[in-house]
Amino acid sequence: MSAVAISNRVNKYLLISVFALLFSGIFFVVIGMLSNTPKMTNHHNAIPAAVVMTKAKVDDTTHSGDKKKLDNTFSDPIILSRAAWKAKKPTGTMKPQKVLRITIHHTATKQQPKITIERKMRGLQDFSQRAATLAGGKKKPAWADVPYHYYINVDGKIAEGRSIEYAGDTNTEYDPSGHALIVLEGNFETEKPTTEQLKSLKNLALWLMKKYAISSDAIKSHKDYASTACPGENLYKLLPALRKELSDEMGEKVSNGR
């Protein structure tokens, strides 16, 4: 056999070996991905803030932020669209609104870092669109859609809820017309908002302020309008600092009552 023929045969075997290794690697990567795919679970509800979380076994570790301050950097928020989390259409009529203020809520449920925001949003919408009995026995009517306009996940990801063109819903005694409703996942009576959540809240609030000409003194919480503990003490006590940072960033010249 000539030297050229031997060289060609060696190259052929080398190519076959390389493709075999590549295929083997891809196969094991795919198998690994499939084995790590989470199982779908049922949804449940029973919370004062009218938020449903997906029922699943999760790591008990709470990713709580220990910072007492927001960082001083700003960027436009990245918002997961309704289409991206596969939202259903609203099931009824909703009240059109002109956005005048920002109102902050918490879900009043334990943070669930192992569940994707897409699944949480689908669960929230399922719960919102049916009548239910809430914690304490209070009845909730079926709403047309998710009650909040924006949902901030434990990792800081933001999802679009109800279209901000329409007023949100509440199970407490106040009129949410004109409010851009932002909810952060967690029970902030016992947990702390994560650093990522606080950064996303700040960026989202600034973006809304610019878009709708909202002043910093129009950024308040659920408990400022209704008899409720929402958004929990561990978030509520951070709001004065949030307003100041946003006011400074917007270049407001009045103190706005702070």
Name each model-derived stretch.
Residues S2-T103, T107, Q111, A142, ...:
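Basic/polar, cationic surfaces and motifs that engage anionic cell-wall
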Residues P96-K139:
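Active-site acidic/histidine clusters and adjacent loop/turn architecture
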Residues A131, K139-V146, V154:
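Glycine-/small-residue-enriched capping loops at alpha/beta junctions
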